[in-house]
């Protein structure tokens, strides 16, 4: 990786989400009317950022070392667990499966923290064209997932909202103070 050197990957793609990433999303979109699911709960970073002001309905993770949440693969859920929205930082390789599964559960409000180039792969363009009611909210800083002080990955929130008009909104999110 240019600028950062190769990094050892977590076997399940688990990287704690810095709270400023979640705060920026919460500033851009109002989620207070939703009951939120976090299907990649990991160490609870997103849940911790949500809890003071938002309803968290359910959190799970496939990782047996996940803290204080149900150990379960989101892709095996057969109900929305009473949740109306998803906010998560999924393993990038599973993003499309997560989106499709969430829609199959009836969860139409979804936010995923992803690499900026997520839709650069031709195999993912189908998802874009099927669900154009979404926003792309690019972070104006590079999140430090590893806590090493020299992050190299540009990130964006991809937000699906089944009640929006069939358009794609693009915006920038400033880093919260």
Pin down the residues of each PLM region.
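Class I S-adenosyl-L-methionine-dependent methyltransferase catalytic core
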Residues: 1-177
């Amino acid at each position: 990786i240019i600028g950062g050197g190769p990094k050892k990957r977590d076997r399940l793609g688990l990287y704690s989400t810095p709270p400023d990433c979640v705060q920026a999303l919460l500033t851009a979109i109002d989620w207070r009317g939703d009951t939120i699911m976090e299907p990649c709960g990991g160490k609870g970073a997103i849940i911790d950022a949500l809890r003071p002001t938002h309803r968290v309905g359910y959190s799970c993770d496939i990782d047996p070392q996940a803290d204080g949440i149900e150990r379960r693969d989101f892709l095996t859920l057969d109900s929305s667990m009473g949740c109306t929205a998803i906010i998560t930082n999924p393993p990038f390789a599973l993003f499309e499966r997560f989106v499709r599964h969430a829609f199959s559960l009836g969860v139409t409000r979804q936010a995923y923290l992803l690499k900026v180039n997520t839709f650069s792969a031709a195999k993912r363009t189908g998802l874009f064209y099927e669900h154009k009611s979404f926003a792309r909210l690019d972070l104006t800083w590079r999140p430090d997932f590893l806590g090493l002080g020299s992050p190299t990955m540009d990130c964006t929130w991809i937000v699906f909202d089944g009640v929006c008009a069939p358009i794609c909104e693009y915006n920038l999110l400033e880093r919260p103070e």
